[in-house]
């Protein structure tokens, strides 16, 4: 099973590529950020785009990067702008930024 440390290290290693796609901040949230993951857990990643670079193509490229990094895991990507007003504050409180 993937570890929190592996996920954070993989994100850090790819930080420059993500930056070129307009990502200002990227972080891990959910069960992995709380060290409560199980075999059924997905990897929850929060991304924050530079407004002028937030577009479908860049989002799909970011999704492809994370799917390649974590091939055997389910990955959920959420943009900061796409956070629900109800659960968003909880996510922002627990996110571990890289």
What are these regions (language model features)?
Residues 1-25, 33-39, 52-98:
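Catalytic core of pol beta-like nucleotidyltransferases
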Residues 28:
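Conserved histidines in hydrophobic membrane contexts and catalytic metal-binding motifs
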Residues 46-48:
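Short hydrophobic/aromatic beta-strand micro-patches
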């Amino acid at each position: 099973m993937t570890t929190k440390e592996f996920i954070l290290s993989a994100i850090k290693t790819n930080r420059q590529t993500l930056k070129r796609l307009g990502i200002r901040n990227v972080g891990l949230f959910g069960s992995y950020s709380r060290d409560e993951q199980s075999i059924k857990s997905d990897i929850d990643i929060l991304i924050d785009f530079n407004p002028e670079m937030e577009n479908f193509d860049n989002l799909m490229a970011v999704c492809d990067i994370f799917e390649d990094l974590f091939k055997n895991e389910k990955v959920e990507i959420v943009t900061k702008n796409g956070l629900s007003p109800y659960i968003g504050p909880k996510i922002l409180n627990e996110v571990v930024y890289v």
